[in-house]
């Protein structure tokens, strides 16, 4: 019985930390900036992102229908994911070619954080959790 309690404690301690540490652990600078903007919920922070597509994607997620628009995104998968999430249309997620982006899209549109665990890319998995923690 005592051994089971230690295993339970170890399992609890290994659970993902809160969203703040999620962003800090992201390697790619633009993805980290996007994560921080999403975490703070401030579309103004999206302006710090160097990548044109990620800047627009970030802004569209935080302020749909305002300054940024998913249709201005050049990358096809990013544009499709943006449209699906902003419109909460799970069927649009199926049109995304990248498996991880498709999984992230489904998790966010379904508001099912447990689905983030199925994403292979660690940075995308972290961003998925941050989006769903807002």
Predicted regions mapped to residue ranges:
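Bacterial N-terminal signal peptides
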Residues: 4-14
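Non-catalytic tandem-repeat scaffold regions and their flanking low-complexity/translocation tails
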Residues: 19-134
